[in-house]
């Protein structure tokens, strides 16, 4: 496994994962409201010949979807916390370089970093490589075997 690629992937997905935590919470609230509406309609239907009603199917689907959201939220939250811990072990300069290269990559990010940090292009890439190595070690432990 290429641990450095995994670390880069974690950095690139950090902001999207963090945003998804808010979105999943909102989605769960919407499903809970929908579940209340389904329960209200439950008294109106009677299954035919012992089969399940469409409303019961909708209730079960709603429950399963909420459970999936809970599990996804837990997993995503852990990944966000792990990434934040990995970033917290870096210097401000290293964090800024990784952010501009991977997390918030925009046009001319190298030039921006050259101006912001006062270094030449080769030095920016050296800082990026060292920061990425340190981040990868903090995320995955020993990677050089």
Label each region the model flagged:
Residues 94, 121, 143-144:
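Secondary-structure boundary/capping signal
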Residues 1-89, 141-145:
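N-terminal interaction/assembly modules
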Residues 117-138:
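DNA-recognition helix of helix-turn-helix
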């Amino acid at each position: 496994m290429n641990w450095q690629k995994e670390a880069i992937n974690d950095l690139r997905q950090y902001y999207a994962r963090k945003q998804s935590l808010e979105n999943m919470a909102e989605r769960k609230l919407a499903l809970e409201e929908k579940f209340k509406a389904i329960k209200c309609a439950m008294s109106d239907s009677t299954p035919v010949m012992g089969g399940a009603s469409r409303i019961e199917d909708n209730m079960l689907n709603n429950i399963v979807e909420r459970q999936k959201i809970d599990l996804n939220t837990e997993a995503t939250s852990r990944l966000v916390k792990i990434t934040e811990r990995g970033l917290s072990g870096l210097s401000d300069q290293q964090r800024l370089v990784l952010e501009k290269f991977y997390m918030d990559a925009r046009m001319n990010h190298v030039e921006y970093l050259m101006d912001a940090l006062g270094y030449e292009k080769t030095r920016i890439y050296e800082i990026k490589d060292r920061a990425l190595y340190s981040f990868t070690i903090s995320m995955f432990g020993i990677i050089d075997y």
